[in-house]
């Protein structure tokens, strides 16, 4: 899944990413956040813990990162 496909899925299903503490395309230090950002041609998936500890969970290409985000988001919502 690409970033565009992920965002289309979110829009189609009226999902508020902020409600689930998801951040796309930038770093955040908000506790309990899951997000991703791109540096160069590499994508990074991160989590922010209770005490604002920023941890990179995974790095890879766009499809790999957005597939992970998609399944994480699906696990957090009841559709």
Predicted regions and their residues:
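Short, exposed beta-strand "edge-strand" segments with a Pro/Gly-rich flavor and a Y/T-containing core
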Residues: 1, 14, 54-60
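Negatively charged, low-complexity tracts enriched in Asp/Glu with abundant Ser/Thr
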Residues: 1-28
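A short, charged, amphipathic alpha-helix used as a generic interaction element across diverse proteins
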Residues: 4, 60-75
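Structured catalytic/translocation cores of nucleotide/phosphate-coupled proteins
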Residues: 6, 16, 36-38, 44, ...
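Short arginine-rich
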Residues: 11, 16, 55, 68-79
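General N-terminal targeting signals
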Residues: 18, 23, 27, 32-34, ...
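Short aromatic-glycine-(Arg/Gly/Cys) micro-motifs in beta-strand/loop hairpins
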Residues: 27-54, 72
């Amino acid at each position: 899944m690409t970033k565009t496909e992920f965002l289309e899925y979110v829009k189609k299903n009226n999902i508020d990413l902020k409600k689930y503490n998801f951040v796309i395309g930038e770093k955040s230090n908000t506790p309990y956040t899951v997000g991703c950002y791109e540096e160069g041609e590499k994508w990074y998936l991160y989590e922010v813990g209770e005490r604002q500890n920023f941890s990179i969970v995974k790095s890879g290409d766009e499809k790999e990162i957005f597939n992970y985000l998609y399944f994480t988001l699906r696990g957090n919502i009841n559709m």
